[in-house]
Amino acid sequence: MKIIKYSPLFLASSIYLTGCSDSETQANQVNEQLTKSADEISKPVVYQVFTRLFGNTQTVNVPWGTKERNGVGKFADFNDAALQGIKDLGTTHVWYTGVLHHALVGDYSQYGIKQDDPDVVKGRAGSPYAIKDYYDVNPDLAVNPERRLVEFSALIERTHQHGMKVVIDIVPNHVARNYHSIARPAGVKDFGEQDDTSKEYARDNNFYYVPGQSFQVPSSEQYQVLGGDAHPLADGLFNESPAKWTGNGARAAKPDINDWYETVKVNYGVKPDGSYDFPTLPASFATKDARAHYEFWQDKNLPNSWYKFRDIALFWLDKGVDGFRYDMAEMVPVEFWSFLNSAIKMQNPNAFLLAEVYNPKMYRGYIHQGKMDYLYDKVGFYDTLKAIMQNKQAASTIFDAQQQVADIEQHMLHFLENHDEQRIASPDFAGNALWGKPAMVVSTLISRSPSLLYFGQDVGEDGSENAGFGTPTRTSIFDYIGVPAHQAWMNNGQFDGANLTPEQASLQKYYKAIMALNNLPAVVGGDMHALNVQGSDRVVAFSRSLGRQVILVLSNFSEQQQTITINLNSQTTANIGANSALHDLLETHSGVLVSNNDQGASFTLTLNALSSAVLTNKVNNEQ
């Protein structure tokens, strides 16, 4: 699927043209965009799947259970039916989470893989963000672990055959405490292999050290390794001398139990006092393209870790991976991202680059200087939408959150669930998956932002299983577990939804209908205006417009029916047509009559509990 990214200049001209009859050439260009086929126009839709959980059919779900007991999914489970089901949600990119070889409690020594110490592994299956070999994939995911890279390559090919791109994680901020690559190409030095461990910091060291002190495993009365199950390596000890700084920056030889103690911090030339040991990027580069950034770094002498991660990214691009999701990107200097991402874009200009950044003050720097394509819109949009769903804020507050990033909205990824966040259906979030219906409508249609769906979200997965490490409400990323609602859709590998309840099947159908609206030009590249709502503070209402196409979106964030009146200004009235009958592209609110008034026009509509309407007139929709 071709993703069309409208430039700000194009967007401005298309909106301006609604009132410019003398700009015939420009008007024709806009209307040409409006008549493109659905295959040519779309916003990116990312489907995040936790790879080891996706194909698991076991339903035992014993806390801290082994893969033999609780089961584990494989690359091979993503068969044609599974991939078509993912594609049917409008997916353009599949983010396969947990692909790279990370620390885990399991014995693959017959394949030359050293066992991991449970004292520095979270859960039994292990965190996907404690990577122990950047040039290898998780042996748990292979039917034949000896051919694990071949099996992943086959998955890449199958995904491409279904018209979707492949995204995997890269975690530049930290690596597993027991990092050791057995799959690295000839001549590639391992992380830390050439470090001067007598120094806390040296520019070309890959890690930071605590000279003269050995690492001590953190302890807590509330935590037992593997839930107390016996293991020959679970002895409260891990041999690391001198100790390294922990992944979240903790500098003690014995980190706290709440630190990221299973990982170690990577050194990018940031001194312990926070100053930089590398060239800074001139401010003018905020407006320069990837090639200019790439050329800037070519004659610079840079810290060793920069080159290591560049080589890792290019290695996976060569394998057919189409992009990366960067974990905790804000903990790594923006200059490094300029260096890495520009190198990636020189190899694949269409590479998809998504970063986890939570500090709004850093958003624009990581987009413009760091050359990120997309950032999480969690702090702001997600947090506000969640508060609205929990009835803690008025529905209209979503517009304040959206306005904060209006200038960069096309770079801000919208989501309601991911591996870090609570499931909508969990009691600590909304307690009912149906709350995802109005929220997904607003999240998807309010702006040019791309969308993310987490596996199981569309069938109401509630994350209630006690997998071992951590607590329910989030589907476990640390242990082997079955995902019940998702398994109902999976139907033992048929991926036909035969075991879904009527409610689950209806919810999935609704998600598909929402995501199909991403093909509307007004949604892909149109302007957004909040609409005046009378009669309820639980309804979000806005218009999206591009050229002559206008849609009106109304979503009810209440478990009670809401009757509202929407007042339209003269511009919207002119585009949508006074005294016209609107029809609903999503639900069944057809025959809504628009009536003239002194300010323009208005209409009255009754929305059922947690329902939405996406209104337009037929002529408008066809143009």
Task: Spell out what each predicted region is.
Residues 1-7, 12, 18-50, 54-56, ...:
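Carbohydrate-interacting/catalytic domains
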Residues 24-165, 173-175, 179-184, 188, ...:
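N-terminal structural segment of carbohydrate-active enzymes
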Residues 30-31, 156, 174, 186-189, ...:
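Active-site-proximal helices and loops of the catalytic beta/alpha 8
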Residues 43, 90-92, 162-164, 320-322, ...:
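Short, well-ordered coil/turn segments that N-cap beta-strands
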Residues 45-47, 94-96, 166-168, 324, ...:
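Hydrophobic faces of well-ordered beta-strands that scaffold small-molecule active sites
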Residues 50-53, 95-106, 169-179, 327-333, ...:
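Short, solvent-exposed turn/loop segments enriched in Gly/Ser/Thr/Pro and often Arg
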Residues 72-86, 301-317, 436-440:
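Short, acidic/polar
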Residues 226-303, 314:
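Long, low-complexity, polar/charged, intrinsically disordered or flexibly structured peripheral segments
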